[in-house]
């Protein structure tokens, strides 16, 4: 695979990325980060799979003929491959991704997006806009753990966004069946992410709009997060 991050839309940084070794290290760092982010998001039945299917579906809906039929064939094939697993995973949990499955999707989706973006000359912010959910999850987790809870960023604390949604649903709705709670959590987060993914695909060449979209998602995410997070989350563990 000839995968490269050739630009981030900032001239100063782009100059460094043109240096092959720096560009390669930045790519490796970015992929390692997003692969782990996908694993973090894989918390409940169907959650990561629904997100991946949403990404691929919006790519299909906003397909441009200039991208080539091979690209469309690949995305459709990947969509149905993931959908096959999804049918057994959601909502009854008959089949699970596991760490290996989450890492695999964490590599396939971003690499596909990077190739798609730079092969077609779309805004480099398009990749971030599509991956904004797992990126935001990791970013807020690091800030919460390191700066507020004074603990290692690698140490689990049970305060990820999907976990807080689950706790709220368990209290408010009171579903006895765990799988039904998983179902509601997945649909809730899907309803938040899908409009942003669709908007990113419709304006994938508009850097200003994509930057605004990323900022709006981050603010929206933080607003909902603060409405759910318990007070002890900002103290030491």
Feature annotation, model-predicted:
Residues 1-139:
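"…together with the soluble PPM/PP2C metallo-phosphatase catalytic core" -> "…together
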Residues 45, 91, 117, 144-147, ...:
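Membrane-interfacial segments
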Residues 100-102, 178-192:
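Select subsegments of transmembrane alpha-helices in polytopic membrane proteins
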Residues 121-125, 142, 154-155, 207-212:
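Extended hydrophobic-aromatic, low-complexity segments
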Residues 140-179:
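Cytosolic, membrane-interface loops and tails of multi-pass inner-membrane proteins
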Residues 202-237:
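Alpha-helical transmembrane segments and their immediate juxtamembrane interface regions
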């Amino acid at each position: 695979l000839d995968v490269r991050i050739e630009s981030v839309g900032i001239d100063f940084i782009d100059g460094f990325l043109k240096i092959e070794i720096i560009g390669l290290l930045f790519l490796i760092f970015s992929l390692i980060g997003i692969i782990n982010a996908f694993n973090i998001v894989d918390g409940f039945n169907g959650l990561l799979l629904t997100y991946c299917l949403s990404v691929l579906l919006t790519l299909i809906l906003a397909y441009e003929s200039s991208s080539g039929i091979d690209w469309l064939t690949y995305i459709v094939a990947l969509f149905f491959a993931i959908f096959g697993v999804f049918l057994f995973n959601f909502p009854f949990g008959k089949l699970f991704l596991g760490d290996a499955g989450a890492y695999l999707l964490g590599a396939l989706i971003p690499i596909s997006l990077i190739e798609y973006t730079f092969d077609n000359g779309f805004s480099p912010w398009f990749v971030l806009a599509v991956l904004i959910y797992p990126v935001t999850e990791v970013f807020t987790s690091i800030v919460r753990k390191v700066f507020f809870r004074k603990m290692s960023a690698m140490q689990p604390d049970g305060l990820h966004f999907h976990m807080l949604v689950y706790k709220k649903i368990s209290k408010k709705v009171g579903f006895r069946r765990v799988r039904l709670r998983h179902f509601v959590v997945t649909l809730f987060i899907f309803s938040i992410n899908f409009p942003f993914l669709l908007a990113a695909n419709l304006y994938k060449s508009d850097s200003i709009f994509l930057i605004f979209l990323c900022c709006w998602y981050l603010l929206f995410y933080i607003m909902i997060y603060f409405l759910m997070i318990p007070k002890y989350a900002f103290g030491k563990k």
